[in-house]
Amino acid sequence: SPGALEDEHNDNFLRF
């Protein structure tokens, strides 16, 4: 996701 940190699936905050 656009905004995910260097984590493959860290869309916990930019998942809008």
Curated annotation (Swiss-Prot):
Keywords on record? Amidation, Neuropeptide, Secreted
Does Secreted appear among the keywords? yes
Q: What is its main location?
A: secreted
Subcellular localization, as worded in the UniProt entry: Secreted
What is any one GO biological process for this UniProt entry?
A: neuropeptide signaling pathway
The UniProt similarity line reads:
Belongs to the FARP (FMRF amide related peptide) family.
Please state what the protein is called. Extended FMRFamide-12
Originating organism: Mantophasma kudubergense (Gladiator)
